[in-house]
């Protein structure tokens, strides 16, 4: 909502290719050839950079899987994605949960960028995905 109008207009019709491979570079920047080959087998998907929720609110589809913007040189594309991710993750837009025993968090996965911070392996983590009333298309 707060993105400058000129920026909104500039990105309104852009499409982003998302890939599982791209997300792995955040976890393992120095993947082996075999790891890269494995992740490259996953299909890519082209999505609009700006997605409109059925409520009318717009979201930026900029998760870790965002690889490049169609029609832009790779360097320019990745710089744009990084700049928009920096904008979207300013402290004023971030909710960081301080977990306590018994907590349950729910969010609309279609319009929310979410991350897990590193946590102790022995702390336990249980996640379920529930679809309450269908999925919204990302066309």
Task: Annotate each language-model stretch with its function.
Residues 1-104, 109-139:
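Non-heme Fe(II) oxygenase catalytic core, chiefly the N-lobe of the double-stranded beta-helix
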